[in-house]
């Protein structure tokens, strides 16, 4: 695994948010919200394998995000600050509670239900945001954990 860097400059971080918001304004139904990925990733500092497993009901209207970490098996209970909670509620409005918050268009072959996005897709999204923001450093999903963590 290669080492990735946090986003240290607040202006660059805000540019990334602006890019994610602009993308979301013109995204097609069923596409992943780039802004939601940034908001949840930055505010929970969870690994991408844990982020992608969140269901809408586990985030929307909640003061805490609770999850069993996939890598360590430990229970994690993370406070969601009021600003992040407002953004999460806005971004998940109108979505069904049992949907994945970061839902893929790919369906499970056995159940025919949508699956969460892969960590590779989350990485692609983060890199598209970073490149559009002019970030030259190596960026990845772990960047979200490192930025405020």
Model-predicted segments: where are they?
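Short, basic (Lys/Arg/His-rich) helix/loop patches that form interaction surfaces
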Residues: 19-31, 97, 123-149
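Non-catalytic DNA-binding core/recognition domains of DNA-processing enzymes
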Residues: 30-40, 56, 80, 122, ...
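Basic, Lys/Arg- and aromatic-enriched nucleic-acid-binding interface segment
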Residues: 7-44
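Conserved tyrosine-mediated DNA breakage-rejoining catalytic core shared by Y-recombinases
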Residues: 44, 53-86
